[in-house]
Structure formats: C-alpha cells, structure tokens
C-alpha cells in the first residue's frame, strides 16, 4: 500500500522582522526575549495558561497528554485566533524519542491541518544549541538570569531585576549571585524538579503559594540542566567545545 510521506520542515533560527512568540516561562521569558531582540528578532510572550487555552489544546489531542503539550498547543491556537498574520513560535525539540522532544512536529501537523501556513515553528535542537545559537554567551546569560532570580527570596526578585540591564552582563549576574548567597533564609528548603513549564507556569500557583508562606523553594536550574545536556553531547572538535569548558 502506498503511504504518503509528509515532511516536517522546522526552522532552527527565527527570521528578523517577523513576530516571534515565546512560551510563557515565568522569570526566564523576559531575558530570553531580550536575547532574541539582540539577535534581530521581534519577540513576544504567548498567552498565559487559562481554562479556555487548555481546552483549545485538548480539543486537538486524542490521548491524555502531559499538561505541557496541550498548554503549548492551546496558547499557539489562542494567538492564531486573534491574529492570522505571519508569525513565528518558539518550540524547541530534542534528538531523543521522549514525548516532549516531539511537540514541535505534532504541533506543526495540527497547524497544517488547520491551514495555518502563516504560523512558522522555530524549533532549535537543544542538544546542538552551542553550535547553532547566534550568541551562546548571551543565551546562557539569559537562562542564568532566570535561575538567579528564582534562587532569590520572592520579595527580593523585583529589586534585583530592576538593577539589571534588559539582558544582564556577567558582572551583574555575579554580583546578584553573591548577594543572594549571603542572605539569611527562613522556612523549609523545598526542592522542586520538573520541566521548565511545570516549574514556572503550570504549577497552578503552588510554588508561589509556598513562597508566600515563607518556605524556600529551590527550583531545578534550567541553565544547569542544559549545560549537562550540552556536555553529554559535546564534540571536542567543534568550536563550541571551548565555550562549554569556559562555562
């Protein structure tokens, strides 16, 4: 039987002068937006999760998918309901077979079925970001900025970020890390692990509520997770190897 093959073409880097929508990821989003703006992109944040957005995403699934998938899909579909102009959406992928590494391909299939040809997915391969990123150093600072803010007490974060540039430099990050490390802490130390979306947007406010009660929530650092991923996939013959060693 003849089987039609539908190629899935996913761009690795965004085009300039076309809106680029980033997933809502708490403190990380503003710094990732600043990074992409420095690279000539036009970044915006996707809508935050609501019941309506989740319903949009779940209407396109036939199984009990983990929450990040219908949340991402629903936020993209919600944005497309408001604006059908040419736009780009950042959905990273991975080389492995795990479900969250395949979101971009499935979302692309849904958009194609809905005739959303003006919606382009930007899907960089996480394992090869040190080779593909337009500015590795700036990208890592964007990730680290979010990690450092989340390491600070919740009531100190606004003051810390107000002292930074849109994308903080190394000196600003070092200073903030030293100051946060010297702060006296109170409450229990609670480790929180999970996907970046689950630790920022999809926790139903549980982590923020714990912090409001005086507990110290230690979120798994995104920069550290990606650094280990890059280190595991390191090619010593690539120029990016020296940058990873420096990090």
Task: Label the predicted regions.
Residues 1-247:
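An N-terminal assembly and electron-transfer interface module characteristic of large anaerobic redox
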